[in-house]
Design a protein with these regions (language model features):
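Class I S-adenosyl-L-methionine
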Residues: 1-136, 140-142
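C-terminal target-recognition/interaction regions appended to catalytic cores
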Residues: 99-191
Length: 191
């Protein structure tokens, strides 16, 4: 959607006609929308988000946004999960707090098999450093990490959850971002 308000909304833009009308006509904004995929911008995550850009036409009255505004072209940087994973030397061999328990791992495997037998797609997802991308990091990740588990078979261990720093990197936070909170649960809830 560019320029003047249109009554037919494109199927790939999940925004109501009322919201578009309010932005473009009532508030006199030039508005454009686009769905962007995180993986196209260097984040190894299979996540799409709607971005909305708006400019006040009264404030920018001399600008023809239909011809001036251009969305940035995604660099389509080749990504892999290994780019955001901690160096194994930073995760102590004795520090297994990110490795899931045997009980949880057995439960994940059992539920995945049950759902597979029913024809459902539910189950944990296992990734390694060569994986091009992960699933979307959910708000409930702190509970069991099932949507993104890191394979540790080469270390003879059960899978592990991402560390909080890895979660920050996956979401595109810079290295300077301070990962801090009262508890591990609160840290994971930041992402």
């Amino acid at each position: 959607l560019r320029g003047e308000f249109e009554f037919e909304a494109p199927d790939d833009i999940p925004m109501s006609k009322e919201a578009r009308y309010a932005l473009s006509e009532k508030l006199n904004y030039w508005v454009d929308f686009k769905v962007l995929r995180a993986g196209d911008f260097g984040a190894p995550q299979n996540r799409e988000r709607v971005y909305i850009v708006g400019f006040d036409k009264d404030y920018f009255s001399c600008v023809d946004f239909d011809s001036e505004f251009q969305w940035p072209a995604p660099p389509k940087t080749k990504t892999r999960l290994g780019d955001i994973l901690e160096d194994l030397s930073n995760i102590s061999c004795s520090d297994d707090r990110y490795t899931i328990s045997e009980k949880l791992w057995n439960g994940h495997q059992r539920r995945k098999l049950e759902h597979k037998n029913k024809g459902n797609g539910f189950g944990y997802s296992l990734f390694n450093s060569d994986s091009e991308y992960t699933n979307t990091l959910s708000a409930r990740y702190y509970k069991d990490g099932s949507e993104i588990l890191i394979d540790q078979t080469e270390l003879g261990k059960r899978p592990r959850k991402l560390t909080p720093r890895e979660c920050a990197r996956l979401q595109g936070f810079p290295e300077e971002f301070i990962v801090d909170a009262v508890s591990q649960v609160q840290i994971y809830k930041q992402f």
